[in-house]
Amino acid sequence: MASVAAALKERGIAISGSDSGIYPPMSTFLEERGIAANPFSAANLDHKPDLVVIGNAISRGNPEAEFALEQKLDYCSLPELLKHQFLLGKRSLVVTGTHGKTTTASLLAWLLEHNGLNPSFLIGGIPNNLGQGARFTDSDWFVIEG
């Protein structure tokens, strides 16, 4: 989610987020980009955002999810956001599985990059060879860790 938040902020969209614990390197990544990350609280949504993205680890009982439902705020899942904001019209390479997704997705993005295809990518970690976990370009290619 942090990489997507950074990409949306680069597009000029106001972003904030919540989690029960964010640690380096992701906390550093967010801080460097000026993205606030707070503990879960319904008060985080008092300003009635245009869209609430609810992660797959969030369930009923979460104060922000409950507030979004009670206040009838627009909400979606991360996959829905990715589809509508980034993936439509792209040639997507989605890496799935139990182990090795980050490494494999990083390798695919690097191979496409070094073959001049300038891919977009969204990877759960921050690969050393790419320097960031997400990049959004005008390329037809998009590598995503699924």
Go through each PLM region and give its residues.
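Phosphate-binding loop of NTP-binding sites
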Residues: 7, 31, 56, 60-146
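N-terminal leader/targeting and accessory segments in enzymes
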Residues: 1-81
